[in-house]
Amino acid sequence: MKRFALALLTLGTLTGCGAPAFAAGAAPRGGAAPEEATRGGPLLADGRRILHVLHRLAFGSRPGDVERVRAVGLEAWIDRQLHPETIDDRATERALADLPSLRMSIPEALRQYPRPDPKLREKAQNGQLTRREMTEMSPPEKRPFRIVAELQAAKTLHAVESERQLQEIMVDFWFNHFNVFAGKGDVRWYVSAYERDVVRPNALGRFADLVRASARHPAMLFYLDNWLSARRDFTVPAGPNKGRKAGLNENYARELMELHTLGVDGGYTQSDVAEVARAFTGWSIDRPQTEGRFVFRPRMHDTGTKMVLGHSIPAGGGEDDGQRVLEVLIRQPSTARFIATKLVRRFVSDTPPPPLVDRVAATYLTSGGDIRTMLRVIFASPEFYGEDAYRAKVKTPFEFVASAVRALGATVDAHAAFDLARATAEIGEPLYQAQPPTGYPDRAEAWVSSGALLARMNFAQALASGRYPRVALDPGSLVAGADLRSPDAVLDRLLGALVAGQTSGETRAVLAAQLTSEEITRSGPDDRGPAKTDIAKLAALVLGSPEFQRR
């Protein structure tokens, strides 16, 4: 009942508008009265600024993070995060060593994780092989699904443990922007290299480099079917499909404009889609099941003149036709505005403030799409530090899992990360498994429902209670010094540790009402032991509160 009541409160709060209102006196120590913003409403007080930055530029705060940021200075911390190469992250890299597929090229992955032998499967179905024999001949750690499982674990490990938190936020952001679905055919062998070679090195670089690299990568070519796209009169010359008529495929062209660059209202027409598709004919994959490398096939290419957004691309350009299209799209003001809107939505509000979008879009155009420069504009803006932006975003399941582990002060290794990645899938966000090219959404309405919130609370209960044995945590450390015989004292200490003491009066009342439950407290000794408060159960309830669901 207590989880259901809290879920109803959380659901009602998260489906409301604006940032949550906190109880009087709930601001963290060291906070000053808000100063007035030069644009918009009041700004966050200094104490809340650090928490706000840790919730937006990182996957939540760990015990001691606020003090560490205050010691180096907020601006200095942000600057370091914008330059992840200056941050020592060797501990995370050592933990990732247990995930060998992360370092493999596509040809290596295809060799090391071969396709299941259909003959073995047939023998198993006919009873000619036992399950044990099948496992010995095709061990799980060598099956193709292992590639995606290791990548999911790596993403989780990075989010929880990496000191380069902003880089991980941006890797997640750009992967969803340039999404590929790991469950589609050969993409499962390509996806790890895609994130490693396309997304990660460019996450804080130039947008143009992300567009160019994603366009040529086998994962994108396969996912959006461009590797099969050919001029309209092309006939397959050899192989099992010899003599088959191939044709133009517009999938990549459409998503390139609608989702990667211009946006759905970017001013292009169906004619532009067809012309862009013609420009990318022949951009294909060399031997997808053994090599998986980009190849340009001149015989598949439409060599005629193309007209894209009023720009003429002369006949005979070959592979360069696609490159020229990319340059046209990258330079468009519509692209600047679309990317600016998505960045502001990610870091400020589900309803991006138009003045800030305008400034970020202008920065895109003057900086040549430099991501780091655009982020600086956001992180220095009054809109970013506005009171109405504080905890105004609802966490995705992935953000919730990572932030819960971090808030409890837990540590994870690669083995624990597998378990947490599965938990993320169970509460609604299987990593690398978003089927539509939009990737996973970044708006509250996609993630808020009573069922989803109950699933989050069940995870919180399992996590805090130690049901993930490979996750090393000690909930007692969060309430050190508190009298465990006093449920109110324990609750206050947990609220301070997990949500900085900032809860609405309604949340505090709902949580306080649970303190009389025998599941939570023992007022005196009995056969279960001495009087005490169940820290894990109470911590789980705090993790399920509306305040913790927000960032």
What do the PLM-derived regions correspond to, one by one?
Residues 63-177, 182-200, 227, 233-236:
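N-terminal accessory alpha/beta regions
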Residues 5-16:
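Bacterial N-terminal signal peptides
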Residues 18-20:
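Bacterial signal peptide processing site
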Residues 24-38, 42-46, 51-65, 84, ...:
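Flexible, low-complexity segments enriched for small/polar residues
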Residues 41-48, 57-60, 64, 68-72, ...:
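Soluble non-cytosolic domains of exported or imported proteins
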Residues 126, 131-136, 151-155, 187-424, ...:
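Active-site substrate-binding loop specific to GH73 endo-beta-N-acetylglucosaminidase modules
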